[in-house]
């Protein structure tokens, strides 16, 4: 069963890169691709159980991924993973994202570590019993 991904990223080129990375490491299906905080919050409120992994950039066209992370956390109440993948996820920001509910935080320059995380998550999701 494919891992259902909510991708919150405003840069078209980066959207393509992330989709390509996901397809290279496992069975991932991007079920929603949004570019703003408002779009992400709306999608989460309308589709609270339609995703397994949220990948969130912090700097968006409008708004911030920092407001999306807790909304995603509240929507799935620990039943999904939230990963921040951003150029702005340095020291204090990383800790703040984790406090808000992110399971992992990666700089975009840490693409290898991000891929390793997604590979491991995809393997765990594939091994989980279907409810």
Place the predicted regions along the sequence by residue.
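Acidic, metal-coordinating helix/loop segments flanking the phosphotransfer/catalytic sites
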Residues: 33-53
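Residue-level signal for the "D+5" position in two-component response regulator receiver
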Residues: 33, 59-63, 99
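Two-component/phosphorelay signaling modules centered on CheY-like receiver
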Residues: 12-32
């Amino acid at each position: 069963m494919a891992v259902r991904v909510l991708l919150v990223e405003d840069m078209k080129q980066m959207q393509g890169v992330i989709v390509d990375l996901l397809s290279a490491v496992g069975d991932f299906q991007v079920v929603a691709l949004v570019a703003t905080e408002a779009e992400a919050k709306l999608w989460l409120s309308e589709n609270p159980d339609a995703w397994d992994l949220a990948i969130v950039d912090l700097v968006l066209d409008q708004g911030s991924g920092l407001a999306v992370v807790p909304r995603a956390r509240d929507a799935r109440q620990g039943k999904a993973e939230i990963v921040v993948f951003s150029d702005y996820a340095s020291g204090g920001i990383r800790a703040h994202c984790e406090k808000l509910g992110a399971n992992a935080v990666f700089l975009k320059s840490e693409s290898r570590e991000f891929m390793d995380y997604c590979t491991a998550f995809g393997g765990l999701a594939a091994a989980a019993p279907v409810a």
